[in-house]
Structures are given as structure tokens and as C-alpha cells.
């Protein structure tokens, strides 16, 4: 099985200490893929300090030189991977930036090149803010040769004219009807690939994530834990789950102790040959 971690919202306001505290120990065992906002707009995102929220001012990543230097060093050492997380993330006129916003082709192109030039590393994956994207957003990332760090679906932009859309849709339908949990493989849509993020958040269930993890293990598939550095200390709403960080640590402990698990970056997993769905149920 391939295991990876996706962390969202690194931006101008993020400090190296925050990320080091969150992932200093974890990256001794495998990389963490950071979804980075290139030009953070201070809107409603909780990764933005409360005193700045609602000002709608724009803060380019390069203006936090301490963070940029720390990221460059961490990426060069293989501790982290840079992924593109929207452009501004928050848009005063558009609830979901990449569900139907303006100039999406330009934003994807400019945002990618900005991060690559700034951090000295390739960007292979796009993670839309709020995991929400539309048809134009998917076209934009496909044109740039990027993959999607979540799953979209027919209603969120998969081309109705592509045979791969319907073969993937049918495969997923059969998987779910047979009792399958999560999506333990990479989806290949032809012009781009997608990897499901398994949420590790205050509202997620450790029991459910462990079931998805077990299913991916049985299939020799993929498991991507998706979280936010800024909420690792927040308690989970489900009993016996502890904090978000504790839930993540439980999954990490399993991944690092099992010799059958290959811990890779999101970009490495999604860029490799896609894992095809297997017939039948995932045994409980």
C-alpha cells in the first residue's frame, strides 16, 4: 500500500515553527505534501490570524522570507512537497474560488510557476480550496499537466464526453454497492488523475479512517490522510478520537510500522501508474 499525507493552507501567515511543531517528528519517517496558497487573501480561512480575517488584503508568499527559506530547505531534503492550493484561496465575490471563479486558467498557470520559481521545486498537484472545483477548474489544471489532490466527480467537472469518465463512474458505483469504503486507488481520467483525501479533521472519525486504511491495505492500494496544521490541537467531536493530531498520529504509527506500506509524497503516488480497482468487497 502507498501512504501519503496532504496538509492544506500553508500561506504568508504560516510560521516555520508551526509547521515544524506539526510535522518535525512525522517527516523523520516520510514526506508531508503541503498544499500552499501563493497569494493568500485574508478572508475567512482559519489559517489566517483572526485579526486579519475579513480585510481581504492579499499577501504573497515571498513576503515571508523566513518561511520561504524554511520550505526550500525542507523540500530539498525530501521532508516536504509543494502543491498548489488555489490562488488567493478566499474570494470576496465567489464563495468557492475554483468552482466557478474568473481567470482560472491564468491563476493555475501563474500560481504554479510562482511556487516553482520561489521554492525551486516542481509542482505536480493542485488542491482546490474547500476541496471544491468545477469544470473550468479541471480544464485549467489539465492544461497545466497537473493532477487533482482530491476527487471531483461527474457533477463537479468530469467531462461527460470522455469514455474514461463513465468507466470510472461505473467502477466507483460497483465499488460502493459492494460495500467498499473510501477510494483506495488513484482515479485516471485521461487528461489528469485524482487521489481521494481521507479527512483527518475535528469532524472525522478515527474508526472510519481505520476502516478505510484497512481496506486500502487489503487491496494494496493508496491511503491519503488530509488535514490542516492549524487544527491538529483541536479536539475531535467523536468519542475516543482525542485531538486531530492524535488521530493523525494513530494513522502514522500504523504506516511507519508496517513493512508493506510505502510512504511517498502525494505527487509521487498520483504520478505513478494508477492503482486499478479490484472486483469484490473489501473484507471487514
Could you say what each language-model-derived stretch is?
Residues 1-32:
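N-terminal regions that are enriched for targeting/export leaders
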Residues 2-4, 31-33, 79-83, 123-125, ...:
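Structural preference for beta-strand elements that scaffold enzyme active sites
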Residues 3-13, 52-62, 96-103, 196-203, ...:
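The substrate-binding groove and active-site-proximal loops of carbohydrate-active enzymes
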Residues 10, 37-39, 87-89, 153, ...:
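Active-site beta-loop-alpha junctions enriched in small/polar residues
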Residues 15-22, 57-69, 104-109, 205-211, ...:
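Well-ordered, non-membrane alpha-helical segments in soluble/globular domains
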Residues 25, 40, 45-72, 125-224, ...:
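Active-site-adjacent pocket scaffolds in enzyme catalytic domains
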Residues 33, 213, 217-284:
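C-terminal domain-boundary segment and adjacent tail
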Residues 36-134, 158, 225-235:
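Metal-dependent polysaccharide deacetylase catalytic core of the NodB/CE4 family, i.e.
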